């Protein structure tokens, strides 16, 4: 959370339910978004992800990831989407996708990938989530349950007008696709890598590496890859079967790995937290510049961005958002908070004020 930047609300989209054909399976399925709405929501979320998380400032590395991602997407089941690939400035070990073809890696995951084939495996996996419409189905499920995902727009004025819709923005960090979807994304990632010229074993290798990373090793402000992509160790064996199937269909020997080239690209990569935005250590959030610390309950997932810090309870039923806002009219804090909640369609049951180091 950067104290000099204030949060803006995020406009949500009104979506109507209907049936659509899955581009990968050809099956008819109920989803809340048409493809046009999916792309529009993705673009909206992309703006918020970039604003709240920020992109990692290395143009050459960004272009490198984008080139590989676009090569994979061009050979996927949905090449016509407006695909975008970017590295966000977070030390967490994660990768995630937004509906419509917007894919993100954190800078924190980059050192844990061994070579270019691993990178293609991660990107291909996330592309698979989009092509098989896992992202859309996850939004549909969350919308049906009226879950307010932890995002910058949790108090958005639009919420009362489009109540029951899933918020975009950083809510993508908490989307779970389920075991079957993860297995399908693994298979698609390996297939996309192979037909694009990369060794599909990179999917297996990156799963093997990430499965050895403990849950607590990479959170640091954003849920890590293992918490949103479960059963990695079991999936390693299943990817082996996928590789055998690919080998029966095409020659996958000698495909691109490029270990040294990948490692050269990482030279100078920043590792760790940015103390100016505060740091997350376990369940503690610490901000040296503002001189305060906050301890969350056990099991809560914490998100720290340039504009806010928030946490969600296991089960996603209770949320907390700590946010710095401008108050040029010097209104009473409780009135300011209640007004924001009311505009968002929320009712205050109980509230009060507290001060921490003069804040």
Regions found by a protein language model. Name each.
Residues 1-10:
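Bacterial N-terminal signal peptides that target proteins for export
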Residues 8, 19-297, 301-317, 323-359:
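A Zn2+-metalloprotease active-site environment signal
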């Amino acid at each position: 959370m950067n104290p000099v930047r204030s949060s803006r609300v995020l406009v949500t989209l009104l979506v109507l339910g209907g049936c659509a054909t899955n581009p990968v399976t050809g099956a008819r399925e109920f989803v809340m978004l048409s493809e046009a709405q999916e792309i529009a929501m993705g673009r909206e979320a992309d703006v918020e992800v970039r604003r709240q998380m920020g992109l990692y400032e290395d143009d050459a590395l960004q272009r490198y990831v984008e080139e590989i991602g676009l090569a994979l997407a061009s050979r996927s089941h949905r090449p016509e989407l407006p695909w975008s690939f970017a590295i966000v400035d977070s030390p967490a070990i994660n990768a995630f996708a937004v509906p419509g073809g917007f894919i993100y890696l954190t800078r924190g995951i980059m050192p844990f990938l061994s070579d270019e084939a691993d990178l293609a495996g991660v990107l291909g996996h996330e592309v698979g989530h989009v092509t098989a419409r896992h992202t859309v189905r996850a939004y549909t499920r969350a919308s049906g349950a009226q879950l307010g995902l932890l995002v910058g727009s949790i108090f958005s004025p639009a919420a009362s007008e489009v109540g029951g819709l899933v918020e975009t923005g950083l809510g993508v960090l908490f989307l779970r696709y389920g075991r079957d979807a993860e297995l399908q994304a693994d298979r698609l990632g390996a297939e996309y890598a192979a037909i694009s010229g990369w060794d599909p074993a990179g999917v297996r290798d990156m799963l093997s590496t990430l499965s050895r990373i403990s849950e607590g090793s990479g959170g640091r402000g954003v849920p890590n890859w293992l918490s949103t992509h479960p059963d990695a160790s079991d999936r390693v064996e299943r990817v082996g079967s996928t590789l055998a199937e690919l080998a029966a269909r095409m020659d996958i020997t000698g495909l691109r790995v490029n270990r040294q080239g990948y490692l050269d690209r990482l030279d100078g990569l920043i590792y760790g937290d940015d103390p100016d935005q505060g740091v997350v250590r376990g369940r503690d959030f610490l901000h040296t510049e503002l001189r305060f610390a906050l301890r969350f309950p056990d099991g809560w997932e914490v998100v720290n961005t340039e504009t806010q810090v928030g946490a969600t309870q296991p089960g996603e039923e209770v949320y907390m958002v700590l946010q710095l806002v401008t108050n040029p009219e010097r209104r009473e804090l409780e009135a300011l908070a209640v007004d924001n909640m009311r505009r968002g369609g929320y009712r205050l049951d109980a509230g009060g004020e507290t001060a921490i180091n003069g804040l």
